[in-house]
């Protein structure tokens, strides 16, 4: 039976706690209590760069190694099939394409694996957190599709953040990070993501499925 949203949320937090070595109560109530101090002023300070799908396609065209990072936004948009089409098209152009799978991306453990299996993505290119993190060091483009907390660098260094200590995907180590989100709203943990304002990050706003369909057309035309 499919777990309820509330049950899977608690299970997800338990997994987060394991990685963070913190109590469940600390994470649940810590996120609520810290939201204003961690997220309140950050957005004003961040230098958000909004790009079009045409510009994103040009960046991907120049790349040789691309890592796709699926998240909850991909699931909501049911964009897994077009994500695979984009990956297949890039691979046909001679590029190396991998998928970075965080254990708690989405709304339940294994959510991304299930979605990508539905789209017949080869298991060989699905890499878990420990396996993929060293790959970001020489990655030309990390393409973030609706993932948020699991790519927030604050988890590594900001002790005031409710997600501090949570293992994350080190996408910020890539040369360029293309982030697709519907809006600037915070993720599951309720904190703003400092990655969005990094010098090597660009935002492509919109529904993941619509954005990827546009991106696919642009890539094919280049």
Please give the residue ranges for each predicted region:
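Conformationally flexible catalytic loops at phosphate/diphosphate-handling active centers
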Residues: 20-48
């Amino acid at each position: 039976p499919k777990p309820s949203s509330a049950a899977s949320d608690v299970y997800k937090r338990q997994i987060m706690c394991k990685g963070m070595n913190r109590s469940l109560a600390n994470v649940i109530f810590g996120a609520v209590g810290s939201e204003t101090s961690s997220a309140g002023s950050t957005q004003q300070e961040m230098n958000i760069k909004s790009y079009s799908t045409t510009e994103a396609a040009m960046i991907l065209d120049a790349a040789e190694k691309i890592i796709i990072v699926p998240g909850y936004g991909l699931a909501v948009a049911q964009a897994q099939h077009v994500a695979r089409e984009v990956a297949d098209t890039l691979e046909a152009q001679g590029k190396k394409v991998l998928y970075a799978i965080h254990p708690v991306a989405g709304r339940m453990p294994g959510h991304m694996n299930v979605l990508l299996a539905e789209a017949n993505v080869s298991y060989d290119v699905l890499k878990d957190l420990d396996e993929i993190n060293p790959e970001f060091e020489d990655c030309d483009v990390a393409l973030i599709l609706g993932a948020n907390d699991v790519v927030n660098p604050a988890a590594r260094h900001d002790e005031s953040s409710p997600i501090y200590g949570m293992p994350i995907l080190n996408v910020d180590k890539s040369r360029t990070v293309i982030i697709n989100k519907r809006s600037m709203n915070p993720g599951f943990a309720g904190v703003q993501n400092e990655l969005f304002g990094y010098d090597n990050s660009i935002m492509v706003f919109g529904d993941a499925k619509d954005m990827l369909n546009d991106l696919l057309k642009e890539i094919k035309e280049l």
